[in-house]
Amino acid sequence: MDALLGTGPRRARGCLGAAGPTSSGRAARTPAAPWARFSAWLECVCVVTFDLELGQALELVYPNDFRLTDKEKSSICYLSFPDSHSGCLGDTQFSFRMRQCGGQRSPWHADDRHYNSRAPVALQREPAHYFGYVYFRQVKDSSVKRGYFQKSLVLVSRLPFVRLFQALLSLIAPEYFDKLAPCLEAVCSEIDQWPAPAPGQTLNLPVMGVVVQVRIPSRVDKSESSPPKQFDQENLLPAPVVLASVHELDLFRCFRPVLTHMQTLWELMLLGEPLLVLAPSPDVSSEMVLALTSCLQPLRFCCDFRPYFTIHDSEFKEFTTRTQAPPNVVLGVTNPFFIKTLQHWPHILRVGEPKMSGDLPKQVKLKKPSRLKTLDTKPGLYTAYTAHLHRDKALLKRLLKGVQKKRPSDVQSALLRRHLLELTQSFIIPLEHYMASLMPLQKSITPWKTPPQIQPFSQDDFLRSLEHAGPQLTCILKGDWLGLYRRFFKSPHFDGWYRQRHKEMALKLEALHLEAICEANIETWMKDKSEVEVVDLVLKLREKLVRAQGHQLPVKEATLQRAQLYIETVIGSLPKDLQAVLCPP
């Protein structure tokens, strides 16, 4: 294995570094720098161990030039270990999400923008948070004073590829726990040879003698997910392991105990309501939170969410304060102490140990928040919220029939995912249609005038439009759709959706204006214009061209070439001194 990993030329690079004190901030990397390809997938790899004197301690960070603040190190240490209530023995995989200290980073190269412009909004890189994907091992070991070997291998990334990174950890971690540092360095070197994440393309990712084949969804894909097509297999030895999805969880397994409350939970997610998820272990907690936040796809989940959260987190006080309304966050925890601390929260979901028996597990009950007890709270959804829409009984019957017929879990998950997707689309399509009607007509966009403005969004006008163009056209669910839209208008998700759509429409308007300029006769326009007006046009065209070349404006390559030709034509008509200013040697 080591010989296989060590073949081929390798750039000089840093050694595995102990996690000593560092200043905050990130070491900027250019695309040609060492670890640039690695950084397209991962920020760093961490190893967290248990020290008898220090407790959880960061043993190493790799690459060793990646800088974490002391607060980030502390968060990674606590979030990478199950708390004492979980009692996880053996190997456990889970994930967490933590805030980056110091706010959003500046992208160190254009690949971030390039990737985000092509990826579905739900799979875009996180600008201000890290995902941590954890493989934790706790086994008896008589050679250790405490009597147990306790260590976590953590992949830190800005990409929400939970399935991919869990699969990667299941390959790397067992080998690492046996061979330690040399194995990890070789793996990181392999990842540094991977192609960049490219939405819409099938990628072959070699690691530890295995080729993992994945396809990252593209923004232009049809809604229904499909596994990557296998091709070029004859040139790949060994044959690749095809990962059906980089991000989709087994929804049916996650939601088995709460299927009767899916409608209520979907509405709580849509409205961005604060929700505490109390689970018996970090793997159950993190999967439930990630499953809940995926319910709104293809909408971006605009609220905060923490798949696994502990009382040691630096944001503990922020989330548990009673001096203001609970924040819009989905919080996954395993410590029952949170029941007491957060009993003022409006919605609390308590789930038990997962049971994968043949029958559908006992469904958690809907209970009033006043029924909350402290540490011995029974499984249930504790909320006073009443769903606006009736639940889909036909879906429940289909899923129950699937359980009786021993239908595979992935097929059950596909049924559930399709239901949630169609529900979200039925809700959002009327909003999309109304928003599109606010766009100025193309014939009103003329080359030499400022483009007309997008009309303002009127909630009353939209609600009136639902009578003839509402969700009832595509969804059979009955209920108070109007009431749901009214509450949605007050939620972070409406604000996030509206800002994103308005931004896209403004860019489209700008692109149409650029096309109108490029299709006009510029020489006729210049005849009666002053030099100041001509120079102003050059500067504005250049600005639009830069934005378009940076993939910010949706324009065709032919339009870009025509715009460049226009700029050259206009500059050529100016006196030599102005030409020298606009085109310095």
Swiss-Prot record:
Domain uDENN: residue ranges: 43-214
Domain cDENN positions: 246-373
Keyword Cytoplasm recorded: yes
GO CC, alphabetical: cytosol; recycling endosome
All copies of domain dDENN, residue ranges: 375-499
UniProt superkingdom: Eukaryota
Known function: Guanine nucleotide exchange factor (GEF) for RAB14. Also has some, lesser GEF activity towards RAB35.
Protein name: Protein DENND6B
Species: Homo sapiens
Taxon lineage: Eukaryota, Metazoa, Chordata, Craniata, Vertebrata
